[in-house]
């Protein structure tokens, strides 16, 4: 059985080093797709690079934890900035859901304005779209617009709650991250997906070259390691041997 493999590089637009790393992993590696933060410092640079790579699938990386929002969000920001306090607000069930829904629409429009096209799919920075309070908003938004959505099915308690016309891969993995970034880890992800009988799989990654912005990230130098593994000729060959076809969310 032919299986579709989407290797999606998150954080397009975060910095020029991030952008160049993603492009390198696409041109000379196994990355097939990316998602962009429309409030990132290098989003214009990302859009410029993407015009030179029309086959690279570019989706939107919904942001509620970093930088300035596109719209006014007094209920979520502190001193005008987004941050990781969103986790505490989610636990306390005090999220400003109307503001979040409006910000999603505004970021979506900003994406269209910057890239000149709709995103191939949606996901989010730090997986905030998988919060139980936020997921229905984002799932409904994606379904209404006919675009795909990253879904971590391990966190969706009731698959029956998903909109019937929502598109996503059958499998998703965030395991290629952290301390064990190796070719063996990547291939274990593929083999586990194949064992589950999934016809499509998304693997999340964050390849980058280090610059001053990336140095400020708690997840800095592992991005270089990811880039090294993702551009390995042996990894590309091993993926092909397993019957996976590289694709984007337009293939789902």
Curated annotation (Swiss-Prot):
<keyword id="KW-0119">Carbohydrate metabolism</keyword>
<comment type="function">
    <text>Involved in the degradation of chitin. ChbG is essential for growth on the acetylated chitooligosaccharides chitobiose and chitotriose but is dispensable for growth on cellobiose and chitosan dimer, the deacetylated form of chitobiose. Deacetylation of chitobiose-6-P and chitotriose-6-P is necessary for both the activation of the chb promoter by the regulatory protein ChbR and the hydrolysis of phosphorylated beta-glucosides by the phospho-beta-glucosidase ChbF.</text>
</comment>
<keyword id="KW-0146">Chitin degradation</keyword>
<dbReference type="GO" id="GO:0005737">
    <property type="term" value="C:cytoplasm"/>
</dbReference>
<comment type="similarity">
    <text>Belongs to the YdjC deacetylase family. ChbG subfamily.</text>
</comment>
<comment type="subunit">
    <text>Homodimer.</text>
</comment>
<protein>
    <recommendedName>
        <fullName>Chitooligosaccharide deacetylase</fullName>
        <ecNumber>3.5.1.105</ecNumber>
    </recommendedName>
</protein>
<keyword id="KW-0963">Cytoplasm</keyword>
<dbReference type="GO" id="GO:0052777">
    <property type="term" value="P:diacetylchitobiose catabolic process"/>
</dbReference>
<feature type="binding site">
    <location>
        <position position="61"/>
    </location>
    <ligand>
        <name>Mg(2+)</name>
    </ligand>
</feature>
<keyword id="KW-0479">Metal-binding</keyword>
<keyword id="KW-0460">Magnesium</keyword>
<dbReference type="GO" id="GO:0046872">
    <property type="term" value="F:metal ion binding"/>
</dbReference>
<dbReference type="GO" id="GO:0036311">
    <property type="term" value="F:chitin disaccharide deacetylase activity"/>
</dbReference>
<dbReference type="Pfam" id="PF04794">
    <property type="entry name" value="YdjC"/>
</dbReference>
<comment type="pathway">
    <text>Glycan degradation; chitin degradation.</text>
</comment>
<keyword id="KW-0624">Polysaccharide degradation</keyword>
<dbReference type="InterPro" id="IPR011330">
    <property type="entry name" value="Glyco_hydro/deAcase_b/a-brl"/>
</dbReference>
<feature type="binding site">
    <location>
        <position position="125"/>
    </location>
    <ligand>
        <name>Mg(2+)</name>
    </ligand>
</feature>
<dbReference type="InterPro" id="IPR006879">
    <property type="entry name" value="YdjC-like"/>
</dbReference>
<dbReference type="GO" id="GO:0000272">
    <property type="term" value="P:polysaccharide catabolic process"/>
</dbReference>
<dbReference type="GO" id="GO:0019213">
    <property type="term" value="F:deacetylase activity"/>
</dbReference>
<keyword id="KW-0378">Hydrolase</keyword>
<dbReference type="GO" id="GO:0006032">
    <property type="term" value="P:chitin catabolic process"/>
</dbReference>
<dbReference type="InterPro" id="IPR022948">
    <property type="entry name" value="COD_ChbG_bac"/>
</dbReference>
């Amino acid at each position: 059985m032919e299986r579709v493999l989407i290797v999606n590089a998150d954080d397009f637009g975060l910095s020029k080093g991030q952008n160049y790393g993603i492009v390198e992993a696409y041109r000379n590696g196994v990355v097939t797709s990316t998602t962009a933060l429309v409030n990132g410092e290098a989003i214009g640079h990302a859009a410029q690079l993407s015009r030179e790579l029309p086959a690279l699938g570019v989706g939107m990386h919904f942001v509620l934890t970093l930088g300035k929002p596109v719209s006014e969000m007094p209920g979520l920001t502190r001193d005008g900035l987004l941050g990781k306090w969103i986790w505490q607000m989610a636990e306390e069930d005090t999220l400003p859901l109307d503001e979040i829904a409006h910000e999603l629409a505004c970021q979506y429009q900003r994406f269209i304005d910057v890239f000149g096209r709709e995103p191939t799919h949606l996901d989010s920075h730090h997986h905030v779209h998988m919060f139980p309070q936020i997921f229905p908003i984002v799932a409904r938004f994606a379904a209404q617009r006919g675009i795909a959505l990253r879904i971590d099915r391990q966190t969706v308690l009731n698959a029956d709650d998903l909109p019937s016309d929502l598109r996503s891969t059958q499998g998703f993995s965030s395991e290629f991250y952290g301390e064990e970034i190796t070719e063996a880890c990547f291939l274990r992800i593929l083999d586990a997906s194949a064992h589950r009988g999934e016809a499509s799989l998304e693997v999340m990654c964050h390849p980058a070259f280090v610059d001053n912005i990336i140095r400020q990230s708690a997840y800095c130098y592992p991005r270089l390691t990811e880039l090294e593994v993702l551009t390995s000729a042996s990894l590309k060959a091993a993926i092909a041997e397993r019957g996976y076809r590289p694709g984007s969310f337009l293939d789902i």
